[in-house]
Swiss-Prot record:
<comment type="similarity">
    <text>Belongs to the bacterial ribosomal protein bL27 family.</text>
</comment>
<dbReference type="GO" id="GO:0022625">
    <property type="term" value="C:cytosolic large ribosomal subunit"/>
</dbReference>
<dbReference type="InterPro" id="IPR001684">
    <property type="entry name" value="Ribosomal_bL27"/>
</dbReference>
<dbReference type="GO" id="GO:0003735">
    <property type="term" value="F:structural constituent of ribosome"/>
</dbReference>
<keyword id="KW-0689">Ribosomal protein</keyword>
<dbReference type="Pfam" id="PF01016">
    <property type="entry name" value="Ribosomal_L27"/>
</dbReference>
<dbReference type="GO" id="GO:0006412">
    <property type="term" value="P:translation"/>
</dbReference>
<keyword id="KW-0687">Ribonucleoprotein</keyword>
<dbReference type="InterPro" id="IPR018261">
    <property type="entry name" value="Ribosomal_bL27_CS"/>
</dbReference>
<protein>
    <recommendedName>
        <fullName>Large ribosomal subunit protein bL27</fullName>
    </recommendedName>
</protein>
<feature type="region of interest" description="Disordered">
    <location>
        <begin position="1"/>
        <end position="25"/>
    </location>
</feature>
Length: 84
């Protein structure tokens, strides 16, 4: 005699919420120290001048200025903050 109810297929119908990653401040936008520029997993974009990188690879402004993106090579991108 079974002591559990039949489970059905609803066990699989779950999904996690999106992580809200991506670029938060685009090239040419003004930033102040502490503004988050990019949230990412891993170093998809590397930090340049005037920015810092958190332990979760978030890139943030350390100086006041304008965001500038540049391609260092075919595969590597870099973001900097240029004083305005």
């Amino acid at each position: 005699m079974a002591h559990k109810k039949g489970q059905g297929s609803t066990q699989n119908n779950r999904d996690s919420a999106g992580r809200r990653l991506g670029v938060k401040k685009f090239g040419g936008e003004k930033v102040i120290p502490g503004n988050i520029i990019i949230r990412q997993r891993g170093t998809k974009v590397h930090p340049g001048n005037g920015v810092g990188m958190g332990k979760d690879h978030t890139i943030f402004a350390m100086v006041e200025g304008v965001v500038k993106f540049e391609n260092r090579s075919r595969s590597q991108k870099r973001v900097s903050v240029v004083p305005a």
